[in-house]
Amino acid sequence: MKVLDQSLLWMLLPFFHLIASAAEHEEVAKHAIKLHRGKGATATQRKQWALDSCRRLTGLLRQKNVVLNKLKNAIRAVEKDTSLSGEEKLFQVHTFEIFQKELNESENSIFQAIYGLQRALQGDYRDVVNMKESSKQRLEALREAAIKEETEYVELLAAEKHQVEALKNMQHQNKSLSMLDEILEDVRKAADRLEEEIEEHAFDDNKSVKGVNFEAVLRVEEEEASSKQNMTKREVEDGLGLSMLIDSQNNQYILTKPRDSTIPRADHHFIKDIVTIGMLSLPCGWLCTAIGLPTMFGYIICGVLLGPSGLNSIKSIVQVETLGEFGVFFTLFLVGLEFSPEKLRKVWRISLQGPCYMTLLMIAFGLWWGHLLRIRPTQSVFISTCLSLSSTPLVSRFLVGSARGDKEAGDIDYSTVLLGMLVMQDVQLGLFIAVMPTLIQAGAGASSSVVMEVLRILFLIGQILFSLAAVFLLCLVMKTYLIGPYYRKLHLESKGNKEILVLGVSAFTFLMLTVTELLDVSMELGCFLAGALVSSQGHMVTEEIMTYIEPIRDFLAIIFFASIGLHVFPTFVIYELTVLVFLTLSVVIMKFVLAVLVLSLILPRSSQYIKWIVSAGLAQVSEFSFVLGSRARRAGILSREVYLLILSVTTLSLLLAPVLWKAAITKCVPRPERRSSL
């Protein structure tokens, strides 16, 4: 320790002169400002000021070299000191190296500032591109400096912690410990080892990864009415890391994985959001029920009121949407549970041909209108494909209960045809997402690469078809050998313990979801197939599972429809009401007419009457256009204006869908069957 004290004294000696001459430096700074402003700027004074500044800088650099030499000598002395343990030697040497790094970084900062000033003086103030490039270089340098400073600060914290631990060990060695103190000391050491084992060092591991950018963020604490409560909460959140971060692009972040995994944490923003949605969904859904509208209207209105265009009280929008996706999963599982595989064999040709013909017709109309309006072909294809998709969760809510009464009928029923076509559209969605990167590149590609792009698209289509064949082959094997024994074992083990049955069915659904996702097919198709496989075990199994899963589905579906409302912007709709109403009605009417024409060609004569109901179910735009639109906007396919138009048209078509569905059911379905369909 004597060596350490002497070394630190030698390190601090050069800075005593700097402290003593602080007043003189302040005068020099004031004089430099005057010179910069042109006050008292005689030639002699400017020359003398430059000479003095260079002399002082040279002296500081000379002092820095002297200190570095003394640090090297101190490091050698520590390494030769036999009285120190190996760990203590490493700690002292590391402390000296931190100080060396600080001196070198300070010197580099001086020369970087001089270089930046020189580059700025040589540049043209009218050249915005050059100034932007200079600003970008300065920003990168500041980011790198911030990372280095952050790393040094963390190392100093570790050094401080080491000193505190060394002091504690010295105190414990000088006094006798009681039995309880010895136990606590052992626990402390074990806790230290545990923290070292579970710490991942994610910052250090990822800062050098390719594609990682350093950005400045703001840390925002929750405001409290009382300043005392605010300080208390801030101290707690500083320790728990539950505050919000905001980057320069106004993206907001919440902690996902803490450094210390031994302390339990909860995202209070997310909890408040779910509680608020649950409380406001009740009056909104109740009001819609009272006036004869579907409850999903109320849930969407709830999202509008709480979203960015309303009270803006939802902070964890991404987390709410993610939880809402589970509502889609369980909704499609129940749809598959009500779906009859035997009836699927009757309509598989209709389910395959109908969506393909409709998508091709929509793309053809889109390219035609795009040619008339001089829109890029890639943009026309993308918009047409987005608008050709229909909402599977929404129509599934329409069909809940409708298939049960029709299962014993011999003719093709509208629910089976509609579900088959929607499942095929989900497959098309997965195919379109796979082809989307090629579509993005096609906008900037040369004519010589058209053949390669076509071959690439054909390869992707073949890959998707192979994945579909693998999925259906797996389903056939599961139905024959797995699902029966699995359910019987699950039912036997869950006697009087329904959570095991619920968990077993949910796990099977998630397994199918994961399999289809790994094979680049939509996760929604996996949930639907899971329900269809379980339904093959008979009517009693279907009723039992439906009784347990429906409450879970209902709650998560509320979150899903509320998350749709978060993307509804009433002010934008009001500003462009005439245009949006015209576009929405045009899209709905076009999809309805195209569906009627296609179904008239592929439906048997005995089932022609259901084409009106099926067309009404398909005459809206899928909520997945939100996802596709956001990807296309980031990729540069869509402009901001077109993206907002797609969002608004999609939302208005979803709001119009229940009215159109109710009108079609009232007009085309016999009275005894209406109650289960409405």
Curated annotation (Swiss-Prot):
List the InterPro entries hit by this protein, alphabetically: Cation/H_exchanger_TM, KEA4/5/6-like, Na+/solute_symporter_sf
Swiss-Prot/TrEMBL keywords = Antiport, Coiled coil, Glycoprotein, Ion transport, Membrane, Signal, Transmembrane, Transmembrane helix, Transport
Membrane-crossing residue ranges in chain numbering: 286-306, 317-337, 350-370, 417-437, 457-477, 499-519, 555-575, 579-599, 609-629, 641-661
Q: Which domain of life is it from?
A: Eukaryota
As for subcellular location, the record says: Membrane
Main localization of the protein?
membrane
Task: Offer an example of a GO molecular function term for this protein.
Answer: potassium:proton antiporter activity
Q: Name one matching Pfam family.
A: Na_H_Exchanger
One cellular component term (GO) for this entry is: membrane
Give the signal sequence positions: 1-22
Parts forming coiled coils: 124-204
The UniProt entry lists membrane topology as: Multi-pass membrane protein
Per the UniProt annotation, where are the glycans attached? N174, N206, N230
Q: Which family does it belong to?
A: Belongs to the monovalent cation:proton antiporter 2 (CPA2) transporter (TC 2.A.37) family.
Task: Tell me, in a sentence or two, what this protein's role is.
Answer: Probable Na(+)/H(+) antiporter.
Name assigned to this protein: Transmembrane and coiled-coil domain-containing protein 3
**What does the organism's lineage look like at the top?**
Eukaryota, Metazoa, Chordata, Craniata, Vertebrata
Its gene name is Tmco3
